[in-house]
C-alpha cells in the first residue's frame, strides 16, 4: 500500500454524504496525537455539521467556498492561555495546531475521505467572524479550518518532491 502521505491531496468537491460519528472520532483522535511544544497540547476542536453554519463560514473568505458542499468542518483552535511564560508571544500554538491539522487530513485520506486545509489565522476577516459565530471564548483562536467529506472527484496527487530545495550541511 502506498504511503498515505503521498496519497493525500486537497479535495474540494464532496458527495454530500455525512461523515459517520465513528469517522469523526477517529479524525479527532488523530489530531490529538500530534506533537506539541513542551507537550502542552493547546488545541481545541470545534466540529461543525450544521448546514447553515457551514454555509455561513463559507462566506468568510474566498478560499472557504467548498464548505457549501461539505458535510463537515473541523475548526482547529488554540487555547492561548496554555502558552507557557517562556513561550509568551512566540505563538508555538500555531505550529502545534498545524501539526494537528495535518494529522487530521492524513487520517481523512486513510478513511477515504477528502479534505482541504482552509487558512484561518492570522486573516482577521476569517478568524474573527468565525470565532464570533462559534461563540469562542477570548482565549480561544481558530487557527485552521478543515473541510471534510466523501469525495465526488478523483484528484491524482502531484509529485511535489524537488531536489532543488534540498541543502545538506550548508546552503
What function would you assign to each model-found segment?
Residues 1-171:
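Acidic, surface-exposed loops and disordered segments
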Amino acid at each position: 500500500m502506498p504511503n498515505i502521505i503521498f496519497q493525500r491531496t486537497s479535495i474540494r468537491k464532496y458527495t454530500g454524504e455525512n461523515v459517520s460519528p465513528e469517522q469523526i472520532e477517529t479524525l479527532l483522535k488523530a489530531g490529538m496525537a500530534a506533537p506539541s511544544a513542551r507537550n502542552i497540547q493547546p488545541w481545541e476542536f470545534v466540529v461543525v455539521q450544521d448546514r447553515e453554519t457551514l454555509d455561513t463560514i463559507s462566506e468568510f473568505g474566498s478560499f472557504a467556498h467548498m464548505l457549501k458542499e461539505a458535510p463537515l468542518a473541523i475548526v482547529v483552535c488554540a487555547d492561548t492561555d496554555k502558552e507557557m511564560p517562556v513561550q509568551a508571544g512566540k505563538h508555538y500554538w500555531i505550529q502545534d495546531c498545524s501539526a494537528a491539522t495535518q494529522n487530521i487530513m492524513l487520517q481523512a485520506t486513510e478513511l477515504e475521505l477528502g479534505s482541504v486545509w482552509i487558512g484561518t489565522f492570522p486573516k482577521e476577516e476569517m478568524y474573527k467572524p468565525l470565532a464570533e459565530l462559534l461563540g469562542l471564548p477570548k482565549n480561544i483562536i481558530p487557527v485552521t479550518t478543515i473541510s471534510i467529506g466523501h469525495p465526488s472527484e478523483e484528484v491524482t496527487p502531484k509529485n511535489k518532491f524537488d531536489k532543488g530545495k534540498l541543502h545538506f550541511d550548508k546552503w
